[in-house]
Amino acid sequence: AATAFGSDPRVWGEVDRPCRTVAILGGSLGDFGELAIAAGADVVVTGEAGYHVAQDLALRGLPVILLGHDRSEEPFVDILMNSAVDAGVDPRHAIKILNPCQWWTVTKGENL
């Protein structure tokens, strides 16, 4: 996740466990962690989640990777831009603006 999104994610749960099924939810996890468990996910990757939600899921065996709300939505920017152009928006007016910074401080050795 760190390499793919160019950020230092926060990780809740076991970082070295095997992973076959990844649940991905852009933006905020909200209450969708239960759906990830029901779907058999080995990990959930999302933008943000409440402290107790992430803690609860990790304790129940579902690691949570938090990328940052903005970073988790970046993969969808091209899809939205292409849809706008397909709908008739002049490509010169479809401008992609990505956030070049990370909004939280990284503390090396942080154990959540």
Residue spans for each PLM region:
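Hydrophobic structural segments
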Residues: A1-L112
